[in-house]
């Protein structure tokens, strides 16, 4: 998987006809962050930040995943979402 394919997928996911489920969006978020930043480098958000905690958890689950593996999973998921929701 190339950086260009990853960037194309990141752009395409913004143009889906229907918004993916929260679970699908957390998958996308976690893999995007792992591919672009690497292992999580922030503290878990506070008790009342439910969205922030969910996003943090999705990214934290990928700790140790290589950039290439995260990019590949991200691209594959975007392709799946394009078939499911249209673009």
UniProtKB/Swiss-Prot annotation:
Tissue specificity note: Isoform 1 is ubiquitous, with a moderate expression level. Isoform 2 is ubiquitous with high level in liver and adipose tissue. Isoform 3 is ubiquitous with strong expression in adipose tissue and heart.
GO biological process assignments: fatty acid metabolic process; negative regulation of protein lipidation; phosphatidylcholine acyl-chain remodeling; positive regulation of CoA-transferase activity; positive regulation of phospholipid transport
Domain ACB, first and last residues per copy: 2-87
Intracellular or extracellular location(s): Endoplasmic reticulum; Golgi apparatus
InterPro entries reported for this sequence: Acyl-CoA-binding_prot_CS, Acyl-CoA-binding_protein, Acyl-CoA-binding_sf, FERM/acyl-CoA-bd_prot_sf
PTM sites of type N6-(2-hydroxyisobutyryl)lysine: 55
Domain of life per record: Eukaryota
Predominant location: endoplasmic reticulum
The UniProt record lists the keyword Phosphoprotein: yes
Modification type N6-acetyllysine: residues: 8, 19, 55, 77
One GO CC annotation: protein-lipid complex
Modification sites for N6-malonyllysine: 55
Modified residues (N-acetylserine): 2
Binding sites annotated in the UniProt record for an acyl-CoA: 14, 29-33, 55, 74
Residue numbers bearing the N6-succinyllysine modification: 8, 17, 55, 77
Pfam families linked to this entry: ACBP
A GO molecular-function descriptor: long-chain fatty acyl-CoA binding
Keywords: Acetylation, Endoplasmic reticulum, Golgi apparatus, Hydroxylation, Lipid-binding, Phosphoprotein, Transport
Phosphotyrosine found at: 29
Function summary: Binds medium- and long-chain acyl-CoA esters with very high affinity and may function as an intracellular carrier of acyl-CoA esters. It is also able to displace diazepam from the benzodiazepine (BZD) recognition site located on the GABA type A receptor. It is therefore possible that this protein also acts as a neuropeptide to modulate the action of the GABA receptor.
Family (UniProt): Belongs to the ACBP family.
Subunit structure: Monomer.
PANTHER family from the UniProt entry: ACYL-COA-BINDING PROTEIN, ACYL-COA-BINDING PROTEIN, ACBP
Identification of the protein by name: Acyl-CoA-binding protein
Organism, scientific name: Homo sapiens (Human)
């Amino acid at each position: 998987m190339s950086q260009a394919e990853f960037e194309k997928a990141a752009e395409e996911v913004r143009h889906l006809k229907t918004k993916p489920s929260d679970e699908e969006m957390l998958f996308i978020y976690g893999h995007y962050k792992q591919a672009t930043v690497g292992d999580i480098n922030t503290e878990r958000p506070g008790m009342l930040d439910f969205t922030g905690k969910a996003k943090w958890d999705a990214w934290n689950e990928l700790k140790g995943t290589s950039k290439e593996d995260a990019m590949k999973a991200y691209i594959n998921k975007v392709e799946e979402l394009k078939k499911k929701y249209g673009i």
